Amino acid sequence: MIQKHAIPILEFDDNPQAVIMPNHEGLDLHLPKKCVYAFLGEEIDRYAREVGADCVGEFVSATKTYPVYVVNYKGEEICLAQAPVGSAPAAQFMDWLIGYGVEQIISTGTCGVLADIEENTFLVPVRALRDEGASYHYVAPSRYMEMQPEAIAAIERVLEARGIPYEEVMTWTTDGFYRETAEKVAYRKEEGCAVVEMECSALAAVAQLRGVLWGELLFTADSLADLDQYDSRDWGSEAFEKALELCLEIAFQI
């Protein structure tokens, strides 16, 4: 039933059925239950070529076509796909993957830091502030999305087994990359946000509506810690390969 509101983004319909469903094309596509859905640029395609992954399908958008791979990791099939940046396209593609069989999803990608955190540090978001639009179409309005304990535990178990230090954080998920004003950054920091990115709360909401497992491993890139001097650093590029390796292991162990 739809909950009406004067502000459209705060309206919500809890009916999981929509006029267009993610599997409306009726493709002959049956994806593995486990999936790594990663914001890693060309690293996904590079890894797929390196290991001889099968390209089993494509997600076609108006501007780009995204290959969907299946890799054999330690004897288990895992779906592998590059996630588009931004809450709306990332949510749409993940919903599509779920529609074709994915049930346990691990994501990874970079985040900006609001606190003094070194580049290429691994972080586990446990809560996301919903300053984007897509999540409000999947879950009723609230200030935060809480991450799933099972996913958090799976991520941290692998990090700890490998002796990789990490921090649990609250993240600020925003659609407004160029609207992270000084006052807003300070406000988010006061609330407890340590990092900022563009998809976490949206993907958590998709997972909640569809009843699947989803979690994310973030690693640090640019810094907004000094409001007077933005530092793009190296966008966390050194951690891309390691992040993908970790996510495959996390997905395998779930």
Predicted feature locations:
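Accessory terminal and edge-of-domain segments that mediate assembly/interaction
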Residues: 1-106, 112-254
